[in-house]
């Protein structure tokens, strides 16, 4: 994951200090891109241990259209706890927009179902897009989408994905986001009978929080280790049928976890 360390180093060298919504302050750059060839291994950060269970369960939760943290809590995942209300609700966040985008006629649009249908029927389409950024509902969301829009692309029998992340918490959030969308790409490729291609991460406001600088500098002293392989249950042919047990990360070796506070 040299690409990730290069991003972190770039922000340390060129970032501008900015005040932010949380009151913590950030060092920020605008516009950055990383590319990961999924044939080279599964792009999960190795210079600190990442919590794969949280990554997988969160993605499955998104795909089910769920916006209440009960499923996450039941599976030992706490990454959304700070934003949920007393009933565990988050408002119309990712899962709602992905699966139930409100249409003007009062019905809803299942963007994920439409995406899979389009990849299968018209893989050369330039409209293979899912958006979580709904301006009409942003104010009702506990946290507006950071990873706002993703697009798929099919060429030579390979499926690639590009994510646009408007707000990128480099130390805590971005490692999760890279792994999550790389995993989604593997899943969609399998159910559409395609091979995985590239995952491309594009960031807007790419920032290190002021209280993550010491941790980032520690991480930059570490050498990346070889990437592991993600194995999916080959029997699963329906994207929404994947379960936690259908994933196996083989050969993941990482440096020790580095603790850092979440800016809420």
Curated annotation (Swiss-Prot):
Q: What is its EC number?
A: 2.1.1.45
State the pathway, as annotated in the record: Pyrimidine metabolism; dTTP biosynthesis
Q: Where in the cell is it found?
A: Cytoplasm
Q: Which GO terms describe its cellular component?
A: cytosol
- Which top-level enzyme class is recorded in the Swiss-Prot or TrEMBL entry? transferase
Give the source's domain of life in one word. Answer: Bacteria
Query: What is the residue range of the signal peptide feature?
Result: none
* Binding site residues for dUMP: 21, 126-127, 166-169, 177, 207-209
Key words, A-Z: Cytoplasm, Methyltransferase, Nucleotide biosynthesis, Transferase
User: What catalytic activity is recorded?
Assistant: dUMP + (6R)-5,10-methylene-5,6,7,8-tetrahydrofolate = 7,8-dihydrofolate + dTMP
Q: Which BP terms does GO give this entry?
A: dTMP biosynthetic process; dTTP biosynthetic process; methylation
One GO MF term on file is: thymidylate synthase activity
Using the UniProt record, give the first listed, main subcellular location. Answer: cytoplasm
Enzyme active site: 146
**Which InterPro entries has this protein been placed in?**
Thymidate_synth/dCMP_Mease, Thymidate_synth/dCMP_Mease_dom, Thymidate_synth/dCMP_Mease_sf, Thymidylate_synthase, Thymidylate_synthase_AS
Residues binding (6R)-5,10-methylene-5,6,7,8-tetrahydrofolate are 51, 169, 263
Which family is this protein grouped under? Belongs to the thymidylate synthase family. Bacterial-type ThyA subfamily.
Q: What PANTHER family does this protein map onto?
A: THYMIDYLATE SYNTHASE, THYMIDYLATE SYNTHASE 1
How does it associate, per the subunit comment?
A: Homodimer.
Q: What is the protein's known function? A: Catalyzes the reductive methylation of 2'-deoxyuridine-5'-monophosphate (dUMP) to 2'-deoxythymidine-5'-monophosphate (dTMP) while utilizing 5,10-methylenetetrahydrofolate (mTHF) as the methyl donor and reductant in the reaction, yielding dihydrofolate (DHF) as a by-product. This enzymatic reaction provides an intracellular de novo source of dTMP, an essential precursor for DNA biosynthesis.
**Annotated protein name in UniProt:** Thymidylate synthase
Corresponding gene? thyA
């Amino acid at each position: 994951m040299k690409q990730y360390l290069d991003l972190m180093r770039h922000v340390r060298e060129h970032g501008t200090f900015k005040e932010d919504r949380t009151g913590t302050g950030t060092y920020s750059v605008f516009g950055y891109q990383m590319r990961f060839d999924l044939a080279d291994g599964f792009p999960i950060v190795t210079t600190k241990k990442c919590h794969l269970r949280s990554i997988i369960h969160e993605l499955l939760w998104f795909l089910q259209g769920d916006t209440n943290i009960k499923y996450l809590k039941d599976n030992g995942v706490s990454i959304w706890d700070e934003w949920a209300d007393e009933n565990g609700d988050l408002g119309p966040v990712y899962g709602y927009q992905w699966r139930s985008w409100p249409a003007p006629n009062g019905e809803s649009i299942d963007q994920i179902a439409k995406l899979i249908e389009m990849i299968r029927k018209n893989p050369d389409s330039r409209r293979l897009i899912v958006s979580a950024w709904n301006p009409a509902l942003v104010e009702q969301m506990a946290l507006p989408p950071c990873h706002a829009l993703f697009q798929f692309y099919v060429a030579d029998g390979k499926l690639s994905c590009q994510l646009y992340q408007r707000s990128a918490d480099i130390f805590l959030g971005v490692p999760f986001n890279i792994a999550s969308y790389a995993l989604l790409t593997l899943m969609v490729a399998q159910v559409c009978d395609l091979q995985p291609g590239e995952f491309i991460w594009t960031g807007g406001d790419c920032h290190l929080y002021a209280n993550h600088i010491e941790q980032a500098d520690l991480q930059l002293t570490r050498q990346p280790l070889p990437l592991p392989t993600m194995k999916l249950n080959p029997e699963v042919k329906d994207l929404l049928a994947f379960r936690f047990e259908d994933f196996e990360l083989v050969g993941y070796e990482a440096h020790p976890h580095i603790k850092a506070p979440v800016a809420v």
